[in-house]
Design a protein with these regions (language model features):
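SF2 DExD/H RNA helicase N-terminal ATP-binding lobe
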Residues: 1-166
Length: 169
């Protein structure tokens, strides 16, 4: 694969607290990577055995990006066929929500499978003590970026333009 990363290994893990968010991230990933040689697999719970087998196949073949919920990724890890030793990027989306849902121990269990040398990114709307504790445990020399809302959402104008001709004058 490009960038020196082996094709049969997982390069990036994006953790999401819910199946719905994992599906949404996966859909966006498919859109972003449409014209690029980037593969992704979404790994989330459900009662579908076929889905579990599809996820297993994606994990064992090696996807560039794995989008996963903590519980389902641990289920696959516990079966012993998932290799996370070459993960370069570990991303926690909505980390505060994951902790609110009781996933702290699951996240720490997943981290044990990851290489020490990796980039970890944590997104959180809030920074309560438990998020700060998680950050201390899994981040090394972190940089904190705080974003303030610059405009109320209702003041943002969204527009779509339709080009009636491909000829530029």
């Amino acid at each position: 694969s490009e960038g020196g990363h082996p094709e049969d290994s997982i390069n990036c893990i994006v953790m999401a607290p819910t199946r719905e968010l994992a599906q949404q991230i996966d859909q966006q990933m498919e859109g972003f990577s449409y014209f690029m040689p980037v593969s992704s697999v979404a790994v989330y719970g459900g009662n579908d055995g076929v889905l579990f087998e599809q996820q297993k196949r994606g994990l064992t073949l090696g996807a560039d990006v794995v989008i996963a919920t903590p519980g389902r990724l641990i289920a696959h890890l516990s079966l012993g066929y998932v290799d996370l030793s070459r993960v370069s990027y570990f991303i926690l989306d909505e980390a505060d929500r994951m902790l609110d849902m009781g996933f702290y121990d699951d996240i720490m269990q997943i981290v044990k499978f990851l290489p020490k040398e990796r980039q970890t990114i944590m997104f959180s709307a809030t920074m309560p003590a438990k998020i700060q504790q998680l950050a201390q445990n899994i981040l090394h020399n972190p940089a904190e970026v705080k974003l303030a809302v610059s405009k109320p959402a209702e003041k943002i104008v969204q527009a779509a333009y339709i080009c009636l001709s491909l000829i530029h004058i």
